[in-house]
Amino acid sequence: MALPVALYVDNEKERYYVVDSTGNKLLSFAGDGKFLQEFTAEGSLQKPYDMARLADGSLLVVEKGRNSLTRVDLKNKKATPLVLKQQGREVFVDRLEVAGGKVYVLDRLSGRILQLDEALQVVKSFTMPADAGWLADFKVVEKKIWALDQKKKQVYSYDENGRPSPPIQLTGVDFPVSLAVDQAGLFYILDRHRGAVVVFGRNGEFKYQFLTKGQGRDNLYFPQEVRFDHLGRLCVVDEGNSRVMVFKR
């Protein structure tokens, strides 16, 4: 793979999908890291950035090259791009999550997280605080949305009805780009510039950090995303080193 930018874990099939933006392709791997196959939509993908699998088996792919949320029918090898709109305004999709049968996207222009229906139409909007900075990532864990503010270095959370909780301030990170939340409620923050994973408690208290910037076995070089798989392992998309690293406790 050239430059991996995102990882999707298919818990049901126990497969790992890596989004290669520069190579304009999706790569699938088994749980042991064995390469399975690649998908390019017959060369039509344009700068894919994120992806997820729907209940019907089709894939949703964020294509930044055409600003679309593209539905991919693997069986019929058909890709259908869709430019999302909310109240007549074009949505610039960044990150994508599917949880509990619901589709969520991050609109990088408005800074909102949007919930979509089966027809990929906006049905709910989660608005960040008025003084929010720049949202870099979000995850949906147990019906709760967790969003990472890169500029203010804060974590926002919302329940499924959109009710917010007080923001959680993070200290000791330089350039947070992604977050993951474990079953104990700890935050795993990926610092792109430092090449490190920094762990915080539920209230934002610093716990520890691991990995450093570099191109060796125990290094990260401009990493892009972090998430937990169905086995509780922490997966880190290490863009600069063209790999995905998997850690277990």
Feature map (PLM): residue ranges:
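Eukaryotic scaffold repeat domains enriched in small/polar residues
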Residues: M1-R249
